[in-house]
Amino acid sequence: MDSTARGHAPLCRTSNQRGLGTRLNPYYQSTPHQPMVQSMSNPIGSYGEQGNAQIIGSSGQVLSTGPPPGLAPVQCNDFDSCYSSCDDISHPSLSRESSDPSKIDDDQTAPMIRYPAPEVVEFATKLGYSTEQLSHVLNTIGVDSRMDDVLSELVKMGLPGGKPENSGKSGSRNSPEPIMTSSASSSSASSSSSHRPIRQSVSIATSSPATSSSTPSKYNPDPSLRAVVVDGSNVAMLHGRKEVFSCAGLRECLNYFLERGHPEVLIFIPQYRREQPRSDSPITDQHILQEIERHIIYTPSRNVNGRRVVCHDDRYILRTAELKDAVIVSNDEYRDLTRENPAWRKIVEERLLMFTFVEDKFMPPDDPSGRHGPRIESFLSKVPVVSSNPLVCPYARKCTYGNKCKFYHPERANGQHMSVTERLMKENQQKKSLGAVKSMQYEMFKNKHAALSRTQSLNVVKQLTENMSQLPPTPESPMQMPRQHMQLQQANSAPWQQHTVVQRHGSSPLTPVNRQMNVYPDMYNMSQQQNHQVLPNQHGVIGGQRPPKMTTTVSQTHLFAPSTAVWGHSELSVGPVNTGSDESLAEVRSRVHFHLCNIFPHDFVESVMAANPEEVNAPVLCELIIRAQKEYRK
């Protein structure tokens, strides 16, 4: 109620409450409405010469003179400016604070607000416990409890399984919950709430009502799913529109894979993201890094003379993905690193998962390898499921669409197309290694049988057998050899000039043989020593016993006549050393070689003719060359 409406002068205030002034002045307790100070406009009382107030009763007599008890003396021009004075200056000598003794007692016994130590909060956060659980434990066992007791209570409570009940009613998650320790008595607790504020234990506030814990409410790890390696810088910068490092994007990405049940999700970010952000690299929601710290791996970084030195975190990402056989979540193609290591290139081609954000929601594609590739479920699993009915490209190897082809190519490993540069490099390497084909082709296509040709034709063997049965036994002369021998002579010339000579050491009528012995005595003795134990029993014609002396009934023509009864090759004939025939064979092979080189590659012709040194038949050599080309292509 206004003081002028009540018809009396304004009061000199010592407190904002009327009841407080009543308790201070015992005179007001007996006459609470009568004592007033006279104002200028309505003189109920007047001031004396020395500034003492005269208290006028209801009948008009002066009750008392002097300052009322509990009130400070005021001058004539020092009325309260709040009521009737136009002066804005308040009373300098008048205290506006409450002098209620009960108020003073309540302020002295107010509860003390104490916060937990930073190391306790950091210790609990790294273990995965929320600040709500830590506040509840410290309110229960006391803020001064030992770390072991705090950990024991946290273990009993368990890890957070879902969203806290009071998370939607809170406002900020930047500071831990204050812990209240009170030593107030029961009398102070029953005092009026208007005299002192009572602070109670409050819960931890969240940055937004939709914020949840770093671990989803339903997390069931699936061992059949691959581990996930997240390029944290790429994800956070894309969520921040490539302007700021948004930690909220990291949390959305982490929750997506944890809800799917991936057993291990690792996020790589540089170490300096934990520090105070600079103006050139802003960070939003930096407190989220503490919430998801269990899944974060900080790559090294340091400051050298005010300059920030950051290690290449992409190498850590690719190396970890190789060790854990994990999927890489990034929109970076790592071209600089795939050129260094072929294994990293294969990882990027086969296990790189791209993504985007749609209204702050992490969203990878359903077909990471293209429209006709595996689905996201098969892509993220350890055992990929291949589509049962893929559409095969009708052009097959002749397809010119390359990577843009929408159909399936079974000849391309893992659906990857070999570029033109890689194909040319591969063909160039094949041409360089073609010099080694000669020896390989020689080993592959040489005759399976021994290089020894037939020593005697069938007709010669038959004639010799008949003559040996008809001849009577005669004592052997001292000039005869102890037994019959067969000798293989090789000329010191090209392989196709090798020939076989059968020599029968017996009586003198074998004139060509004796002449050959006289011409090549040293070679004869050497071959006799080498082949004495090997060749006598090859064909069963000459037995182990020493044969009797034979008269020569085998004609020269019969002995040296060519025969194709077994092998069917005219060059495998029995004959003496003939230099003219060797020259003719070399000429024939040279002519065949010239014509074959006009048809086939020179390397294949050389290798096949070297593997078959006695072959001069052109159709047979052509067949062998074609077979060699087919084997080489396989």
Curated annotation (Swiss-Prot):
UniProt keyword list: Cytoplasm, Endonuclease, Hydrolase, Magnesium, Metal-binding, Nuclease, RNA-binding, Zinc, Zinc-finger
Gene3D superfamilies per record: 3.40.50.11980
Zn finger (C3H1-type) location: 387-412
PROSITE patterns according to UniProt: ZF_C3H1
Expression sites (tissue/organ): Expressed in the intestinal cells adjacent to the pharynx.
Main location: cytoplasm
EC number from the UniProt entry: 3.1.-.-
Physiological role: Endonuclease which binds to the 3'UTR of target mRNAs and induces degradation of the transcript. Acts together with rle-1 to repress the expression of the transcription factor ets-4 by binding to the conserved ADE (alternate decay element) and RCE (REGE-1 cleavage element) stem loop structure in its 3'UTR, which controls the expression of genes in the IIS and TORC1 pathways, including those involved in lipid metabolism and autophagosome formation. May play a role in the clearance of apoptotic cell corpses.
Protein name listed in UniProt: Endoribonuclease rege-1
Species annotation: Caenorhabditis elegans
Record gene name: rege-1
